[in-house]
């Protein structure tokens, strides 16, 4: 079983690699205490990216889920932090089994704690989660060249 830290490192490396493949300049904030993991220069501005990694894919439901929060433990108390547009501009999401890289804009996902991504896309608006068409959030569809 991989540690959470290792899984996160795999996701950060995959998202970084995707930006580099697309010719997007990427900067890495120093230290481990920043809200963003990467800063990428695209669409005319520097964008703060918080990377989230999912290492599961539900074959029966054809989807994967990814947490859009961070959690810390201080003095035996568990704290969960929701990100806002003051913290980041995008979630860079990587799913290990499918090798899918997505960019989720914070404006559309700041109120969510978990994103459920159906793959391939199915409209599930009548179900218990909002339909998210993964194709809308592929790097190629977010980054203007």
Annotate the PLM regions.
Residues 1-34, 40-145:
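Mixed-charge (Asp/Glu-Lys/Arg
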């Amino acid at each position: 079983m991989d540690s959470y830290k290792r899984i996160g490192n795999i996701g950060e490396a995959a998202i970084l690699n995707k930006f580099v493949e697309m010719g997007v300049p990427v900067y890495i904030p120093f230290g481990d205490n920043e809200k963003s993991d990467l800063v990428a220069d695209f669409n005319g501005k520097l964008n703060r990216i918080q990377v989230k990694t999912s290492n599961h894919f539900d074959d029966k439901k054809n989807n994967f889920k990814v947490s859009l929060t961070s959690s810390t433990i201080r003095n035996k108390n568990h704290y969960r932090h929701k990100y806002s547009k003051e913290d980041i501009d995008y979630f860079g999401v990587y799913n290990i089994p499918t090798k899918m890289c997505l960019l989720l804009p914070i404006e559309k996902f700041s109120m969510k704690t978990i994103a459920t991504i159906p793959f391939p896309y199915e409209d599930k608006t009548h179900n218990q989660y909002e339909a998210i068409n993964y194709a809308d959030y592929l790097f190629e569809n977010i980054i203007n060249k």
